[in-house]
UniProtKB/Swiss-Prot annotation:
Expressed by the venom gland. Belongs to the ant venom allergen 2/4 family. Changing residue 28 to V: In Sol g 4.02. It is found in: Secreted. SUPFAM superfamilies: Insect pheromone/odorant-binding proteins. It comes from Solenopsis geminata. Residues 1-19 form the signal peptide. Changing residue 33 to K: In Sol g 4.02. This is Venom allergen 4. One of its GO terms (cellular component) is extracellular region. Keywords: Allergen, Secreted, Signal. GO terms for molecular function: odorant binding. Monomer.
Length: 137
């Protein structure tokens, strides 16, 4: 019985560890560091640079999620799987991002403005807090 419990715990632990895409996180961390350094700081910017729409726009643009034609919807929604451990949170992330995409991209306006409005919507819905970036203390 003890062996069964131990093996079960190890399987769950392994699943949790490999649920996020470590390679992608390393790439994104490097990009975020560059964007945090290069994006001009405004007086109304949040203290946490990961909640700064301009920093996130910079990072996601470098990853090809935001393009001159708009958002790569599939890639953005799938990003939930790369940065979230809990399956319920992944589902919630995808749902919230989909709602924000529909809300923002159904309105007219310049692509960059709509992309930044999308990030603003996603931040307000609490998607960052679902990711490993929101879990960091």
């Amino acid at each position: 019985m003890k062996t069964f419990v131990l093996v079960s715990c190890l399987l769950v632990f392994t699943q949790i560890i490999y649920a996020v895409d470590i390679k992608e996180l390393k790439i994104m961390n490097r990009i975020l560091e560059k964007c945090i350094r290069t994006v001009p700081k405004g007086e109304n910017d949040p203290i946490n640079p990961l909640k700064n729409v301009n920093v996130l726009y910079c990072a996601f643009s470098k990853r090809g999620i935001f393009t001159p034609k708009g958002v790569n919807t599939k890639q953005y929604i799938n990003y939930c799987e790369k940065t979230i451990i809990n399956p319920a949170d992944i589902k919630q992330c995808k749902k919230l991002i989909s709602k924000c995409i529909k809300k923002v991209y159904d309105r007219p306006g310049p692509i960059i403005e709509r992309s930044k409005n999308l990030l603003s919507c996603v931040l307000k819905k609490g998607v960052l807090e679902l990711t490993v970036y929101g879990k960091k203390k």
